[in-house]
């Protein structure tokens, strides 16, 4: 079974019933599922290529309505290693983990935190399931705070999966989550709704700084 989850995340002008903010919660419990979300168009092509070649169990890709970043699509496709995250930048104080469309917000948060003199790691997880547990554990032990970003409700989402894993291995580094609240989100422009519900780089920066004390 291969699932392409269109409108994964906030759907904006399509109306409140079209927001795809619950799918991680109802898919991540399926045994053996490979669940992916790309940060840009190139990665989306690679994930489709990887999905087509993967035959060991069910797989799914969640992707948004409209463009992701406007990246020109490359000609050469690549098979992604299942469950392997991309460490975009190393850091020692804070690790930011930006899933899919929220990677850009993580990038902006990184710039703001670095302006405060902090050493900030930036991670593109690629896989919701299986998680790259080695990368997660490395940065949870190395950094003082982790912060996850996802276009999904907080309950049973990607950040919850990260917390579940770290708790299971006895790592108690604080994890701040930037995600949608446990409610039905109204109709509106994505940027307006993100401002209204606190899904911005400014809010993320404030929350991380508060965790650092």
Question: Predicted regions span which residues?
Answer:
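Short glycine-/polar-rich loops that comprise or flank the Walker A/P-loop
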Residues: 1, 32-33
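Thiamine diphosphate
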Residues: 4-20, 53-213
């Amino acid at each position: 079974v291969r699932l392409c989850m269109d409108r994964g995340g906030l759907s904006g002008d399509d109306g409140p019933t079209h927001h795809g903010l619950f799918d991680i919660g109802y898919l991540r419990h399926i045994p053996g599922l490979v669940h992916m979300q790309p940060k840009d168009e190139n990665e989306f092509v690679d994930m489709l290529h990887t999905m087509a070649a993967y035959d060991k169990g069910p797989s799914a890709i969640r992707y948004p309505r409209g463009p992701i970043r406007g990246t020109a699509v490359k000609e050469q496709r690549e098979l992604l290693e299942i469950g392997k995250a991309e460490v975009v930048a190393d850091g020692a104080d804070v690790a930011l983990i930006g899933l899919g469309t929220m990677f850009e917000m993580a990038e902006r948060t990184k710039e703001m935190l670095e302006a405060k003199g902090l050493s900030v790691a930036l991670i593109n997880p690629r896989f919701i399931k299986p998680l790259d547990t080695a990368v997660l554990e490395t940065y949870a032990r190395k950094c003082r705070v982790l912060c996850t970003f996802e276009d999904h409700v907080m309950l049973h989402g990607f950040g919850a999966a990260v917390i579940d894993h770290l708790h299971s291995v006895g790592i108690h580094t604080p994890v701040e989550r930037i995600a949608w609240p446990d409610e039905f989100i109204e109709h509106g422009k994505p940027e307006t709704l993100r401002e209204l519900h606190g899904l911005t780089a400014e809010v993320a920066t404030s929350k991380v700084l508060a965790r650092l004390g």
